[in-house]
Amino acid sequence: MIKVLFICHGNICRSPMAEYIMKDLVSKAGLSDQFEIASAATSTEEIGNPVYPPAQRKLAEHGISCEGKTARQMTRRDYETYDYLIAMDHNNLRNMARFVGGDPEHKVSLLMDHTRRPGDVADPWYTGDFEATWQDVLEGCTALLEELR
C-alpha cells in the first residue's frame, strides 16, 4: 500500500483538490487498492471546515466529489504513517518542519517538483484562480502517479 498525504495551509483548497484528483487518477488507473490518499493542513485556522465552495465546484466540474471532507491538521504521526508527504508550496514545507522535524526518510517534497515545472502551487484562496490551481494540481498528481506506478 502506497500512502500519500497532501498538505497545504488550511486543507480547504489545494491539498483536498490534490487528494481527490489523485484518488480519481488512481481509480481510473485501476490502482485504488494499492493507494491510501489523504490531505491535511499545517495551520489550525480551518479545522473541521468543509472544502472551500469554489474548490468543490472546480472538482465537481470534472466529475469529482469531495463530499464529507473536512479540514484536519497534520500531526507528527503522519510522518510515520505516510510514505509521501507532498506540500503545495515552500511555506507549507517550512510549517511542516514543526511537525516532522527533519526528513531523514526523504518523504517530503513539493507537488510541482514531480513535474517539469518545479515550484509552488499558487493558493487560490488569495489568487481566486481555481482553474490555474486545478491545472497545476492535475499536472502534479499525474506526474506523481507516474513516478509511483
Where are these regions (language model features)?
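Conserved active-site segments centered on acidic
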Residues: 1-81, 146-149
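Phosphate-binding/catalytic loops
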Residues: 84, 90-149
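Helix N-cap/beta->alpha junction signal
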Residues: 15, 89-90
